[in-house]
Swiss-Prot record:
GO CC list: ribonucleoprotein complex; ribosome
Compositional bias (Polar residues): 11-20
Keywords: Ribonucleoprotein, Ribosomal protein
Residues of the signal peptide: none
UniProt-recorded name of the protein: Large ribosomal subunit protein bL28
Record-level GO BP terms: translation
Length: 62
């Protein structure tokens, strides 16, 4: 399963590293996701949730 936020849909983004000579190499920026248990349809479920969603109170841990 991809490390994508279950609540906000945030997923890793891609781009380039740029050196002083402006060479470019591919890289990715990951999302700060944590595996937590939350209530989904009244039942506990383990899902990946972003730290931003946890801090802002979008989900309640079980």
């Amino acid at each position: 399963m991809a490390r994508k936020c279950y609540v906000t849909g945030k997923s890793p983004k891609s781009g380039n590293n740029r050196s002083h000579a402006l060479n470019k190499t591919k890289r990715t920026w990951g999302v700060n996701v944590q595996k937590v248990r939350i209530l989904v349809d009244g039942k506990p479920k383990r899902v990946w949730v972003s730290a931003r969603a946890l801090k802002s109170g979008l989900v309640e841990r079980v």
